[in-house]
């Protein structure tokens, strides 16, 4: 079936050019998912989801675009790490990931063959506690799932591979290697997002590495004398380098995209790559070219989770010229994610894997050289022509009586 020509409503054109009449028609019994979305998702958040599907498939998932995905909320316990995210990674549509540690931790349950059960949320939690069962809204599993996953993690993290300082991308790469070996032993491929990212060279970062059961187990082995240290500065520089050098694709015409599932700290860590480049490192940068978010967070409470793309422009996180290529859909990510994955896998040809994990060191070295050059130029321009003025530590001049 031919892809229908799409008039994006965010294009700069008169209202009459994109105000398409709604022409209701019965949904046929043999309709495909892509046709359902293109023709029947006509308004409100169904229309925003349609716009996301079309923007991703027609513009974002192109070889010259570097796509960063942020992941928050309990997505992997639902199975979506395996069913919806891993296929996007294998198809080359996601180049790097920033996730909560909890999503990566619960993802490992499936690689270990642990059982999580679909239930309902209207249960007696006191009774569940007595029965040693854990609840994530309408998902229930045994407490032993946590204990066995913790034991696996501590066994792996005690290995020599982890006995040094590293960033979370390297940490998750090595962890993904062990999980992949476990998949092979169990004869169950594609059981874990971590293993898929390892195979595809997609770096996974965690913005708050201590804020999850993975971080808790890292802390536990530190009490045993482990030399493992997670260094967040490594992550900040690596992600900034990825965003900065995204421009080099397609002969200097490359673009950068932020695909945000939920919000929270991973969203900020993905978007802060741009202020890190221009505000802190002093390098020229215009912001991400594409901003796509699925969230249930309101923008009017001031939280980052609900902050809209236009607000991000004021921070230099999003290119003002790219505002027409931004969409926010207010819905449950567990509804939207399977839909957009199925749509894009149907509409898009797979992209070559960028394997950014393998290029991290080289990109950071180049970023460091550019930063040091910028610092040197900045110092030359600021050579004092007058006697220095004493200041407080914050920089405020000290007024003399």
From Swiss-Prot:
UniProt-listed Enzyme Commission number(s): 2.5.-.-
Transferase recorded as keyword: yes
GO terms, molecular function: deoxyhypusine synthase activity
Short name of one Pfam family: DS
InterPro entries from the UniProt entry: Deoxyhypusine_synthase (IPR002773), Deoxyhypusine_synthase-like (IPR023496), Deoxyhypusine_synthase_sf (IPR036982), DHS-like_NAD/FAD-binding_dom (IPR029035)
Swiss-Prot/TrEMBL keywords: Transferase
Enzyme class: transferase
This protein's record includes keyword Transit peptide: no
GO CC, any one term: cytoplasm
Residue pairs linked by disulfide bridges in the UniProt entry: none
SUPFAM superfamilies named in the record: DHS-like NAD/FAD-binding domain
Record family assignment: Belongs to the deoxyhypusine synthase family.
Name of the protein in its database record: Deoxyhypusine synthase-like protein
Species of origin: Thermosynechococcus vestitus (strain NIES-2133 / IAM M-273 / BP-1)
């Amino acid at each position: 079936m031919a892809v229908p020509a799409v008039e994006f409503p965010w294009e700069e054109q008169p209202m009459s050019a994109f105000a398409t009449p709604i022409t209701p028609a019965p949904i046929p019994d043999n309709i495909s998912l892509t046709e359902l979305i293109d023709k029947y998702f006509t308004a409100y958040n169904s229309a925003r989801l349609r716009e996301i599907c079309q923007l991703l498939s027609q513009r974002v998932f192109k070889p010259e675009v570097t796509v960063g995905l942020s992941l928050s909320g309990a997505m992997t316990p639902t199975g979506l790490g395996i069913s919806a995210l891993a296929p996007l990674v294998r198809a080359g549509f996601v180049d790097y990931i920033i996730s909560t540690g909890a999503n990566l931790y619960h993802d490992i349950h499936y690689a270990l063959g642990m059982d999580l059960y679909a239930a309902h949320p209207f249960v007696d939690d006191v009774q569940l506690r007595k029965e040693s069962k854990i609840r994530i809204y309408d998902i229930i599993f045994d407490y032993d799932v946590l204990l066995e996953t913790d034991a696996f993690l501590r066994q792996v993290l005690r290995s020599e591979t982890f006995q040094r300082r590293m960033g979370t991308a390297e940490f998750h790469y090595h962890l993904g290697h062990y999980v992949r070996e476990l998949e092979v032993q169990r004869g169950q491929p594609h059981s874990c997002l971590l293993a898929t990212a390892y195979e595809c060279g997609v770096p996974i970062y965690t913005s708050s590495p201590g804020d999850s059961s993975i971080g808790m187990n890292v802390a536990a082995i530190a009490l045993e004398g482990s030399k493992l240290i997670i260094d967040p500065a490594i992550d900040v520089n690596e992600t900034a380098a990825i965003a900065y050098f995204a421009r080099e694709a397609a002969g200097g015409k490359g673009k950068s995209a932020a695909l945000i599932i939920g919000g929270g700290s991973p969203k900020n860590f993905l978007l802060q790559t741009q202020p890190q480049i221009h505000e802190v490192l002093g390098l020229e940068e215009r912001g991400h070219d594409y901003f796509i978010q699925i969230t249930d967070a309101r923008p009017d409470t001031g939280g980052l989770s609900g902050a809209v793309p236009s607000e991000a422009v004021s921070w230099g996180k999003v290119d003002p010229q790219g505002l027409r290529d931004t969409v926010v859909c207010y819905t449950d990510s567990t509804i939207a994610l399977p839909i957009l994955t199925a749509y894009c896998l149907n509409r898009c040809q797979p992209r070559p894997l960028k394997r950014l994990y393998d290029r991290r060191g080289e990109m950071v070295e180049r970023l460091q050289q550019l930063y040091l050059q910028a610092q040197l130029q900045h110092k030359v321009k600021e050579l004092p022509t007058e006697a220095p003025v004493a200041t407080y530590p914050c920089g405020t001049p000290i007024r003399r009586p």
